[in-house]
């Protein structure tokens, strides 16, 4: 089959007509499948809109063209749908999981998550996947008959298990919900969820290269340190001699995305043909993931990640901003603990213990955008770092 062509629906895909349903039963939609309905609910949620002002690597006011969690999620969804189409899987469920995967991230990217996890260490820590589950099952308040978005079992399973089974140290937010609606934490997730997870990796690799080039943290020729990228750059230079770096970089990103999508599709098809799953049940009970990079491509992908770690994520300019961002999150947490009156009215209502209060404060901070966190810090402190 040609790359990009839609395969017939596979027997191991998740069939919306055979969904395991929702925690709160609802009448079916006259115009949309259950998974399309899930996707639309994510898109229309408040948490999804907030991703517009949440950091990937660069803080929101560093430039209008850098990725945010919103643009990243859209790019993950585009890649995931392409893979789902080639493998005969449900595109709507795949898109739902791609769009929802970052809903639980706090402000300031991984720096914000590290800081919030440290602040909450004595109270169970902070896990962004558990926070995503809380958002879609409790925190969104948009419907008269239920809290959250009341997503299907398949969407909730994919949100929780897209990176694999949860055997040990299950975050309390996930364990508590699982007691009400068993997501079979011990098993692998659907192929749709596995695709969403790999698509996240593909989008990160390609688009962090794009943002790093745009920020001047490295050049196209610096990327020749990565053997796979050196070969791609050589091909680009032969086909387009004298091309300016802006266009060389853009062409490299396109080539990389296409290469990784094709590699994942081919390897996943090989694994599926060996395993011969005949249903989503077979996929979940398989001994390992069925969506993956081939071994040689996985090595190339790891080399790209090492390059980005050394030249971008550990760059002093980025590190300085992230240190200041961690300080902002820690300052806010400490102030809200010491002075609950600085929180919005009613936010700690019903909290009977220090742990309850700490977790509620953590939820409040996790929901902030970068911009709101900075505004709050300005309101509560005499001096706020300039994240530039």
From Swiss-Prot:
This is Deoxyguanosinetriphosphate triphosphohydrolase-like protein. Pfam families: HD, HD_assoc. One of its GO terms (biological process) is dGTP catabolic process. Residues 69-205 form the HD domain. HAMAP family: dGTPase_type2. Keywords: Hydrolase. Belongs to the dGTPase family. Type 2 subfamily. CDD domains: HDc (cd00077). GO terms for molecular function: dGTPase activity.
């Amino acid at each position: 089959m040609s790359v990009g062509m839609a395969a017939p629906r596979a027997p191991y895909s998740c069939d919306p007509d055979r969904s395991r349903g929702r925690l709160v039963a609802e009448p079916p939609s006259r115009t949309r499948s259950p998974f399309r309905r899930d996707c639309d609910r994510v898109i229309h949620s408040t948490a999804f809109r907030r991703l517009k002002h949440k950091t990937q690597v660069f803080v929101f006011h560093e430039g209008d063209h850098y990725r945010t969690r919103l643009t990243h999620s859209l790019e993950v969804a585009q890649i995931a749908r392409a893979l789902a189409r080639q493998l005969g899987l449900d595109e709507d469920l795949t898109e739902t999981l791609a769009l929802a995967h970052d809903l639980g991230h706090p402000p300031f990217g991984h720096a914000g998550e590290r800081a919030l996890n440290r602040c909450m260490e004595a109270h169970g820590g902070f896990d962004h996947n558990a926070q995503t589950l809380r958002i879609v099952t409790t925190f969104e308040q948009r419907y008269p008959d239920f809290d959250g978005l009341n997503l299907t079992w398949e969407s909730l399973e994919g949100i929780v298990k897209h990176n694999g089974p949860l055997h040990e140290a299950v975050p309390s937010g996930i364990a508590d919900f699982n007691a009400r609606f068993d997501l079979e934490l011990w098993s692998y997730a659907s192929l749709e969820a596995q695709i969403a997870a790999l698509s996240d990796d593909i989008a990160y690799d390609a688009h962090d290269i794009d943002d790093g080039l745009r920020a001047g943290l490295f050049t196209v020729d610096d990327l020749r340190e990565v053997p796979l990228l050196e070969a791609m750059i050589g091909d680009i230079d032969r086909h387009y001699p004298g091309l300016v770096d802006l266009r060389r970089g853009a062409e490299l990103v396109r080539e990389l995305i296409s290469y990784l999508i094709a590699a994942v599709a081919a390897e996943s098809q090989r694994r599926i043909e060996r395993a011969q799953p005949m249903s989503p049940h077979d996929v979940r009970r398989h001994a390992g993931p069925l969506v993956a990079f081939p071994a040689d491509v996985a090595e190339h992908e790891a080399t790209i990640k090492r390059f980005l770690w050394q030249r971008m994520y550990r760059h002093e300019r980025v590190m300085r901003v992230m240190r200041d961002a961690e300080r902002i999150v820690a300052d806010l947490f400490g102030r809200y603990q010491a002075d609950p009156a600085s929180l919005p009215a009613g936010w700690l209502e019903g909290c009977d213990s220090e742990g309850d209060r700490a977790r509620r404060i953590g939820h409040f901070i996790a929901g902030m955008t970068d911009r709101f966190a900075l505004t709050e810090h300005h309101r509560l402190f005499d001096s706020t770092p300039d994240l530039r």
